Amino acid sequence: MKKKVTLACKNCGNRNYTTMKSSAALAERLEVKKYCNNCNSHTVHLETK
């Protein structure tokens, strides 16, 4: 079963994206490079709780 998670920008903390995460990968937190409108650049986005 997949779980819905929110991704937040590492620089400004803005929660820009939501994605689905499989239950098999629940142990480690997602870290994805995405575009942030607030920072106006591509930054690392981390999974929030």
Curated annotation (Swiss-Prot):
Which GO biological process entries does UniProt record here? translation
| GO MF term set | structural constituent of ribosome
State the Pfam families in the record.
Ribosomal_L33 (PF00471)
User: SUPFAM superfamilies per the record?
Assistant: Zn-binding ribosomal proteins
Name a GO CC annotation attached to this entry.
Answer: ribosome
Q: Which residues form a coiled coil?
A: none
Q: What top-level branch of life does the organism fall under?
A: Bacteria
Question: What keywords would UniProt list here?
Answer: Ribonucleoprotein, Ribosomal protein
InterPro entries membership: Ribosomal_bL33, Ribosomal_bL33_CS, Ribosomal_bL33_sf, Ribosomal_zn-bd
Entry annotated with the keyword Ribonucleoprotein: yes
Q: Which PROSITE patterns match?
A: RIBOSOMAL_L33
Q: Where, by residue number, does the polypeptide cross the bilayer?
A: none
State the family it belongs to.
Belongs to the bacterial ribosomal protein bL33 family.
**What is the name listed in the Swiss-Prot or TrEMBL entry for this protein?**
Large ribosomal subunit protein bL33A
**Native source organism of the sequence:** Bacillus licheniformis (strain ATCC 14580 / DSM 13 / JCM 2505 / CCUG 7422 / NBRC 12200 / NCIMB 9375 / NCTC 10341 / NRRL NRS-1264 / Gibson 46)
Name the encoding gene, please. rpmG1
